[in-house]
Amino acid sequence: MSRACRGESSGGGRSSLGYLFEPEPEDIIPDHSTKSVQGTNKAPKGNIVLGDKMASDEADQEHQAAAPLKKEDSNPIVSSRSASNIYHTNQVGNNSGLLITDRPSTRVRCAPGGPSSLGFLFGDEDA
């Protein structure tokens, strides 16, 4: 009886969901015509550098990387954004503690009995 080794299939077909997102093996055709030599430092002819932009056919092929998030922007606790979307909960359990949402706050920020009181609904004269 053979023992399964790490990285080997135990048979039975595909066990991952890759078949939903990857093309069939017979559909994959290697394209070796677009390979280029990466070791040279020569600039291709016809390239014009304008500031940070390159004007040529190869400029269309370059991929622009997204700017990485600043540490402040990626962490809402130290972010300069308003703190209206950070709530502290006092419940005991797995979902207790700091709750961060992107919704605006609906918390009433007035003193009890103050201008946000619903006394006018119940006949209070002061409201």
From Swiss-Prot:
Database matches in InterPro entries? SPR1/2/3/4/5
Q: Which domain of life is it from?
A: Eukaryota
List the residue ranges of the region (Disordered): 1-100
- The biased composition feature labelled Polar residues covers 76-98
**Any one GO CC term of the record:** cortical microtubule, transverse to long axis
Q: Which UniProt keywords apply?
A: Microtubule
Q: Which family does the entry's similarity section mention?
A: Belongs to the SPIRAL1 family.
Role, per record: Acts in maintaining the cortical microtubules organization essential for anisotropic cell growth.
Name the record gives this protein:
Protein SPIRAL1-like 4
